[in-house]
């Protein structure tokens, strides 16, 4: 006989947080949102990869490209580049993010002394960069022989056939810094010598990076930027359970910091095969998340398979219609509460803490805090990020309102046979996502700052200043339908201010 759950499943909107004692320490500026991204032995070692804010962007064509990945990494979060594209194009997106190093920039424009002014101008037109490194082999890490900037030539007075060696600033006239130089030290040198660009060289005088004066303000503006040991932005990449034998090596070679299996339902042998492939070929050096699941059994399965984190949620996304078309899924809040308990149980048994990601169901900013209180270590957001300038879709004017396009990976538009098909066919028999618009909201930086300030303020109301303390000490209450109505404005007539109802 089929098993029937005794209680209905619930969404975030059916819960409220009950305030706790707020001490003098509980102010937003003292709240830390740092949170683990991958599994580790909690209490015995530091987490190998942590997020500075509990936000990752969804593995979607309409959300996560390299532009959004850089913007989110600057704020302390992580993007998973969408996998519903060719292996080559996904790997190239990853490479572009990894080359956008925070402060230390790998030279994208490189020539030899034997090239010409015409080559310099062509590179500037192609890449948009005015600084060209001159190395022995025209490689970004070749022996440094000089640099060319717009100050070194005048197109109106020089022949485009002129050799670079005749107008470049030679090595002996350059001020450089060793590869051990910190970003602060590099900026100090730039300001002391009034430089626009500082080459960073190794012990063999080979170029490693540039540090640019123009980036100084940006460094100060993004203190939580998520970086690796080489000061490059962190980036994730989505994979599927079909072409992973070819896709994973390409993404690892491109520099992806973490992978995530993109599937509407993760409690399957297909996910085990993908994780087994990673462990057999890379051991624990390659990190991989899996999902999605909605109960204890699904979590235990993926944790025991070796997943580095587990995604929770089926059918809760704003463009996902899996529940409607297949009749499978569960209320996001109920799913998260059960999986969080399973995560803690697994930790007590093994000493290994496997972070969980709440994927879907976030409609309002306060839902973020609820999800964290219910046990999520971080949140995967699609619609939220699709609204911003940095998302890859078009901004349109529809009925007098600016919107951005937003479509699900289960829609025909995404052509995502790799997520849903199980029998080898590449057609999509039916859709599990819709094609839609979301209201345009402006820049990622401004909106993320506003949302996270609300999260921090709510945490202070709960008497906590860290996510682990919120998970441990939060008090939540299920509310009735009339309580939900009571929580909004009622029994009044709103005044029209010309600025909306804000």
Task: Indicate residue ranges for each PLM-predicted region.
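Alpha/beta catalytic cores of nucleotide-metabolism and tRNA/nucleoside-modifying enzymes
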Residues: 1-21, 109-112, 177-178, 184-188, ...
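Bateman/CBS regulatory modules and CBS-like beta-alpha motifs in cytosolic regions of diverse proteins
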Residues: 27-51, 58-60, 89-129, 134-138, ...
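Surface-exposed amphipathic alpha-helices with a cationic face
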Residues: 44-48, 73, 98, 121-125, ...
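Short beta-strand/loop segments at the ligand-binding rim of alpha/beta enzyme cores
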Residues: 48-57, 103-108, 228-237, 278-294, ...
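Catalytic cores of alpha/beta
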Residues: 67-70, 244-254, 288, 294-312, ...
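Glycine-rich phosphate-binding active-site loops on the catalytic face of alpha/beta enzymes
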Residues: 74-89, 256-268, 308-326, 362-396
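Catalytic beta/alpha-barrel core
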Residues: 80-85, 109-112, 131-135, 176-178, ...
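Active-site-adjacent beta->alpha loops and helix N-cap segments on the catalytic face
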Residues: 85-96, 141, 156-161, 206-226, ...
